[in-house]
Amino acid sequence: MKRFEELFAELADKVDRQDPDSGTVQAVQEGRHAIGKKVIEEAGEVWMAAEHEGPDRTAEEISQLLYHLQVLMIACDLDLEDVYEHL
């Protein structure tokens, strides 16, 4: 099981290294618009899971949304501290 900070560090490292086998690197290369569309899609799936599919499926969908939000953060050159300042 990964923690939020651990996942962010792993994703940022893949992007820094330009890992050719990484879907994260590919997503960042596709740009903010494509990532943003994925964030919207995943947010809708979280909502639908919460309404109709129960806690386990909701947790799974939330984890996918958090992943895509982290990818968007990396694409925007934000780090966790940038976000934590606003919590």
UniProtKB/Swiss-Prot annotation:
Pathway info: Amino-acid biosynthesis; L-histidine biosynthesis; L-histidine from 5-phospho-alpha-D-ribose 1-diphosphate: step 2/9
GO process terms (BP): L-histidine biosynthetic process
Molecular function as annotated in GO: ATP binding; phosphoribosyl-ATP diphosphatase activity
Reaction(s) the record says it catalyses: 1-(5-phospho-beta-D-ribosyl)-ATP + H2O = 1-(5-phospho-beta-D-ribosyl)-5'-AMP + diphosphate + H(+)
ATP-binding is among the record's keywords: yes
Subcellular location per the Swiss-Prot or TrEMBL entry: Cytoplasm
Predominant localisation class: cytoplasm
Gene3D superfamilies to which the protein is assigned, alphabetical: MazG-like (1.10.287.1080)
Enzyme Commission number: 3.6.1.31
One Gene Ontology cellular component annotation held by this UniProt entry: cytoplasm
Enzyme class, spelled out: hydrolase
Top-level taxon in the UniProt lineage: Bacteria
Keywords, in A-Z order: Amino-acid biosynthesis, ATP-binding, Cytoplasm, Histidine biosynthesis, Hydrolase, Nucleotide-binding
NCBIfam families tied to this protein: histidine_hisI, PRK00400.1-1
HAMAP family hit by this protein: HisE
Family: Belongs to the PRA-PH family.
Protein name in the entry: Phosphoribosyl-ATP pyrophosphatase
